Amino acid sequence: MSQEIEIEFKNMLTKQEFKNIASALQLTEKDFTDQKNHYFDTDSFALKQKHAALRIRRKNGKYVLTLKEPADVGLLETHQQLSEVSDLAGFSVPEGPVKDQLHKLQIDTDAIQYFGSLATNRAEKETEKGLIVLDHSRYLNKEDYEIEFEAADWHEGRQAFEKLLQQFSIPQRETKNKILRFYEEKRKSI
């Protein structure tokens, strides 16, 4: 089973802050790649209620089904490779580690349905302390900018992330994860 603990820190950015960081990190357009997240839950938001999220990510022509759920530190991610997914509306969770983990969470996998998609243009830059990720996301007629910092250790990562924000004079902003931002925007459109 492909599982990992994800420790990441996030902060929303203005478009100008995003451009400033990209420039300082010497990131050009060719460093950014497109990926698309397709989100799923039950009509009663059973996953959201458990602070979990289910997505299929299409990146570089490959599809990965990922379940994210809370862990003692960070998030536990369970991954499963998929062959091409052509019918998102009719998608059902295949046998494998993700379905097994959903059952452990007591989620009815037959009730899972497609909620929508979020497209992200992403660049990554490895540093001594962790991975800097710049995301420009588009979903439901909205766009936003975000910086993420992934680290192996929570305390060292937090310290490095705060230093990074200070370096660019960026205030810490409450930042929800992409799926929550997507759901909030979707709720506005209903």
UniProtKB/Swiss-Prot annotation:
Short name of any one Pfam family annotated for the protein: CYTH
Keyword field contains Chloroplast: no
Domain CYTH: 4-189
E.C. designation(s): 3.6.1.-
Transcription regulation listed as a keyword: no
Transmembrane segments: none
Keywords: Hydrolase
Name of the protein in question: Putative triphosphatase YjbK
Species for this entry: Bacillus subtilis (strain 168)
The encoding gene: yjbK
